[in-house]
Amino acid sequence: MPVLHNRISNDELKAKMLAESEPRTTISFYKYFTIASPQQTRDALYQVFTALDVFGRVYLAYEGINAQISVPQSKVETFRQQLYTFDPALDGLRLNIALEDDGKSFWVLRMKVRDRIVADGIDDPSFDASNVGDYLKAADVNAMLDDPDAVFIDMRNHYEYEVGHFENALEIPADTFREQLPKAVEMLREHADKKIVMYCTGGIRCEKASAWMKHNGFNKVWHIEGGIIEYARRARAQGLPVRFIGKNFVFDERMGERISDEVIAHCHQCGAPCDSHTNCKNDGCHLLFIQCPQCASKFNGCCSEQCCEELALPEEEQRRRRAGRENGNKIFNKSRGRLNSKLSIPDPAE
C-alpha cells in the first residue's frame, strides 16, 4: 500500500516548491454532503491529489469536504475532471480561483479527517444544516447593499474583518466561528424583521451560519454565493462596482488578496496605515498581527521588544525558554485577547 502522508521535511518541500518553474493556481472549494467513510475517502483522494502534484490543506468529515489547495496550471483541468468524477456529489462543484496568486500558497499536501469541516460547536439534533438561506450573486449583493432593510453580517474572525469587509457590515466579536454563532443570534434579535445577508471568505462558514439563523427563527436570510472570492470575481467580470473594501484575508502563505485600493487597517505597533499580516518570527510566540515595513525592520519581524530580544538569543537558549513555558502559549495564536495583551490594543467589544 502506498504511503498516504508526507515524509519529507517542510524546509525541503518549501525549497522544492520555490524552485518550480511551472506556475500554480490556488483553488478553494467545499461541499456539505454525507461521506459514509471519511478516512477511506481521504486516502483515496490523497492518491488522486498526489498524482497531480497538488499541495494544500484538505479536511474531510461525515458532513463533507473543505479544501484550500494549489495545482500546477497544466493540470488544473485534469484535476477538475477527476474531482468531478470522484463522487457524484462533487460533479459540477464550484471551484473558487484565487483573485491574486503568486503560485506559492502551499508547498505540502495535508489531508485530515475531522469531526466537522467547520468547527461550529452545534450540538442540537434538530438542527438541519441543509436548510440554508438563499444565494446572492454579485449584482444581487450590490442591490442589497443599497437596501435600507438589509443587514450584512461578517462571519469571519476579527483579524479578517480588520483588513477588509463590505460597506457597513457588522462584525461578530469572537475568536472562533463556534463562538460567533450564538453571538450572531443574540446581536441580530433587534434586526429580526430585516433582511440578513451573511458572508465569509469562500462561502463555507456563511452557508452553515445561514442555516443556523433560520433554525433560530430568522426567516429572511441570504448568503453570498462563493463568498468574497466569487463575489469580487463576478463583479469584476460583469463590470459591476466592487463594494468590498480593503483586503480579503486568506489562510495560506499569501495571507491576503487585494480587493480594493483602500487600506483600512493600521500597523499594530506604530499605527501607520497597513494591512499586511505576519506571524511573529519568535518561534516561542508566532502571534498573528499587522506590521508595517518600518516596524518589521525595527523589531526584526517580531511583535514586541521582548520577542525581538529573545530571537537574538542563541538557538539553544531559545529552545530552553520555549520548553519551559506553559502549553497554553499556543503557536500561531490568533485570538483577539492575546493580540490585545501583547500589543496593548483596546478591545472594541469592551
Curated annotation (Swiss-Prot):
Gene3D superfamilies: 3.30.70.100, Rhodanese-like domain (3.40.250.10). GO terms for biological process: tRNA modification. Its EC number is 1.14.-.-. It catalyses: uridine(34) in tRNA + AH2 + O2 = 5-hydroxyuridine(34) in tRNA + A + H2O. PANTHER family: TRNA URIDINE(34) HYDROXYLASE (PTHR43846:SF1), UPF0176 PROTEIN YCEA (PTHR43846). SMART domains: RHOD (SM00450). GO terms for molecular function: oxidoreductase activity, acting on paired donors, with incorporation or reduction of molecular oxygen. It comes from Salmonella paratyphi B (strain ATCC BAA-1250 / SPB7). It holds the Pfam family UPF0176_N. NCBIfam families: PRK00142.1-1. Residues 319-350 are annotated as: Disordered. Belongs to the TrhO family. The keyword Oxidoreductase applies. InterPro entries: Rhodanese-like_dom, Rhodanese-like_dom_sf, Rhodanese_C, TrhO, TRHO_N. Catalyzes oxygen-dependent 5-hydroxyuridine (ho5U) modification at position 34 in tRNAs. Residues 146-240 form the Rhodanese domain. It is an enzyme of class 1 (oxidoreductase). Residues 319-328 have a biased composition (Basic and acidic residues). It comes from the Bacteria. This is tRNA uridine(34) hydroxylase. Keywords: Oxidoreductase, tRNA processing.
